[in-house]
Amino acid sequence: MIKQRTLKQAAKVTGIGLHSGKKVTLTLRPAPAHTGIIYARTDLDPVVYFPASAESIRDTQLCTCMINDEGVRISTVEHLNAAMSALGLDNLIVEVDAAEIPIMDGSSSPFIYLLLDAGIEEQDAPKKFIRIKESVRVEEGDKWAEFKPYSHGLKLDFTIDFTHPMITKEVRNYKMEFSAQHFIQQLSRARTFTFMKDVEYLQSIGLALGGSLDNAIVLDEYRILNEEGLRFKDELVRHKMLDAVGDLFMCGYNILGDFKAYKSGHSLNNKLLRAVLANENAWEFVTFDDKAEVPQGYQVTEQVFI
């Protein structure tokens, strides 16, 4: 049986909030089977809890942001979410003492190391997957994202299209068969990116105050401003795929299907997830009693826990 997973022990890290520029402490705590992923604002009295769900995402303007009915929010959850998805975590309490998850270096890599350092523990309950049964597609202008059935795991295909001399045709598309190893090696280190003109505007209205060359790739009209350059020649599209992995994990379950997207972002990713879940014929829950039946991308996950 493929079992649910949580952490062996709590883990804590302190970083900077991307928009506030202030110190943020993140604490990840183990949770019992069937708890799911629950975010919590511990700086508020009483503590405000946010169970992960597609519907909890109500702002996707600059990041993926959870907002409850009272207007309380937790921003920039996507990079941590992607790391939890990659490691197959099912049950976790995510405590944060601010309105946003720390940006760290702008990628998922610090969260991967934090989670692995705490240790992954299997629980005595079957792990549920969402399996796509019918094709679902959403569009916004020329942008689109879709899921199609794919029984062998999660297949990812993402294309970006920006007019910039550094973003040539050769680095606009990335494809990957999802697994913990592939995510860690190919996606986790890909950093968020932005354009200098956008940074200047956001900071003028009190946002992105924690943004810097230490936690984002910044481009001007002609070049990349980071002295160290890129971690991958196609780091930008890899990061967009990382974002999509995190956005799609807002349902709290690993998805089995074929995901393709063109110029998609947080808004369209969430729109696709909502469209899938709203169509009862498009998906089903599945568990695997026999490990031999598990899609290949999820058969090898245990290797990264050693």
Swiss-Prot record:
GO MF: metal ion binding; UDP-3-O-acyl-N-acetylglucosamine deacetylase activity
Recorded GO CC terms: membrane
Alphabetic keyword roster: Hydrolase, Lipid A biosynthesis, Lipid biosynthesis, Lipid metabolism, Metal-binding, Zinc
Pfam families: LpxC (PF03331)
InterPro entries per record: Ribosomal_Su5_D2-typ_SF, UDP-acyl_GlcNac_deAcase, UDP-acyl_GlcNac_deAcase_C, UDP-acyl_N-AcGlcN_deAcase_N
Active site feature: H266 (proton donor)
EC class name: hydrolase
E.C. no: 3.5.1.108
Listed pathway(s): Glycolipid biosynthesis; lipid IV(A) biosynthesis; lipid IV(A) from (3R)-3-hydroxytetradecanoyl-[acyl-carrier-protein] and UDP-N-acetyl-alpha-D-glucosamine: step 2/6
GO biological process, one term: lipid A biosynthetic process
Reactions the enzyme catalyzes: a UDP-3-O-[(3R)-3-hydroxyacyl]-N-acetyl-alpha-D-glucosamine + H2O = a UDP-3-O-[(3R)-3-hydroxyacyl]-alpha-D-glucosamine + acetate
Binding locations of Zn(2+): H79, H239, D243
Cofactor field: Zn(2+)
Protein purpose: Catalyzes the hydrolysis of UDP-3-O-myristoyl-N-acetylglucosamine to form UDP-3-O-myristoylglucosamine and acetate, the committed step in lipid A biosynthesis.
Family of the protein in this entry: Belongs to the LpxC family.
Protein name in UniProt: UDP-3-O-acyl-N-acetylglucosamine deacetylase
Organism: Glaesserella parasuis serovar 5 (strain SH0165)
